[in-house]
Amino acid sequence: MFINRWLFSTNHKDIGTLYLLFGAWAGMVGTALSLLIRAELGQPGTLLGDDQIYNVVVTAHAFVMIFFMVMPIMIGGFGNWLVPLMIGAPDMAFPRMNNMSFWLLPPSFLLLLASSMVEAGAGTGWTVYPPLAGNLAHAGASVDLTIFSLHLAGISSILGAINFITTIINMKPPAMSQYQTPLFVWSVLITAVLLLLALPVLAAGITMLLTDRNLNTTFFDPAGGGDPILYQHLFWFFGHPEVYILILPGFGMISHIVTYYSGKKEPFGYMGMVWAMMSIGFLGFIVWAHHMFTVGMDVDTRAYFTSATMIIAIPTGVKVFSWLATLHGGNIKWSPAMLWALGFIFLFTVGGLTGIVLANSSLDIVLHDTYYVVAHFHYVLSMGAVFAIMGGFVHWFPLFSGYTLNQTWAKIHFTIMFVGVNMTFFPQHFLGLSGMPRRYSDYPDAYTTWNTISSMGSLISLTAVMLMVFMVWEAFASKREVSTVELTSFNLEWLHGCPPPYHTFEEPVYVNLK
């Protein structure tokens, strides 16, 4: 029965499918918001109205893309679908909690959309800094609704994290050690630990902001002995691990894709890859104040956060060079998924290099809150996380659906998207170096050229999004069945065929390990 299957589901494959569909839908909303931003900035002068409505759009774009697109697709979609199949578990450890994790997201999304519909909306930026987010600068219910939205999304992610940690540690075959699980499983495990440690701090921060706004507390108000800088520390102690939460599952997917299409039986440097992800996860928690170089910290504090941030480049470099070593000498198959993976490696590295530039506290004083920062994090998100999602989608689409995509169109889609995102975000480095500030709806006309090119690039990306919707429709309409998939020890998720039966591994699986 439809309701029993999709509303009260306890099946990891169905819940994974729900996450993928929800994430795709939210991605459309986030894309629409981003196109509003680029339409406003395509020429000098005003299009939408004042800076408040513009900043409401910017804030909603960030929240939708992070909490309702990337996280549901990577952790909820790919994580739910693949982790049990990869470790030979019959399902997740807590199947009903898994269902609740998903169904907390639509109400959360509804609250976020409601926040923009009441009063003037939450034009705070996704950081929601007081005093701008206080009840003076943002009177009315908008910011409160945003905070409640974040509470629900946060609970959803915490429950999901508990579920994945329990599943991965406890539901492997007895003979399988943690160091025999695939890298995607490792990446989800580390991501879940990060979520579990980071989200409660965000919850504390936004709850204090909620009481400051409504119950007259003064956690972040100097008039009552509070400090707005405390909020920034709490937010970024969550916010920096969050950006690693967004990219780590992508690392796992890229490892699988590169290994598979290089014709290798395993990735290069498995243990090094695991160590690198663990290091990134640990270091991600001790670099948060590099987002706050302009708030007047001591010089020795700034020196620490600069050097600690640069240390993260080492395990990241281990991963990049291990992917290249996996490619080396392989029988490379130029499939669409491989193109996404290669694009990921190149563009993620570019984004990482601009991150190293921003890690220098003295340089960051000049570049903070300019478009250079926007360019940096969109290279690692829009061309890191999203390229990993796209690569994972075209690679595992046959597993999820039983049908194959049209390879030619998938390659054309990659090409259009590649051109589009680079045309959108590469010029933003120049804008930032020229001093164009973030979060303003208008600019001096000296910045016109690069902004116009950037906005044209966003329209190219839009055509890519529309082409992908068509490709998925075409695949389901044509019904090309999957013929064969080459099995190695590194892609056991394909063991049961495409798509796999509703219940897999119902009996304990026999594992013969070397």
Swiss-Prot record:
Pathway it works in: Energy metabolism; oxidative phosphorylation
EC number: 7.1.1.9
GO biological process per UniProt: electron transport coupled proton transport; mitochondrial electron transport, cytochrome c to oxygen
Principal localisation: mitochondrion
Protein name: Cytochrome c oxidase subunit 1
Residue sites binding Cu cation per the record: 240, 290-291
Membrane-spanning ranges: 12-40, 51-86, 95-117, 141-170, 183-212, 228-261, 270-286, 299-327, 336-357, 371-400, 407-433, 447-478
Gene: MT-CO1
Membrane-side (Mitochondrial matrix) residue stretches: 1-11, 87-94, 171-182, 262-269, 328-335, 401-406, 479-514
InterPro entries associated with the record: Cyt_c_oxase-like_su1_dom, Cyt_c_oxase-like_su1_sf, Cyt_C_Oxase_1, Cyt_c_Oxase_su1_BS, Cyt_c_oxase_su1_dom
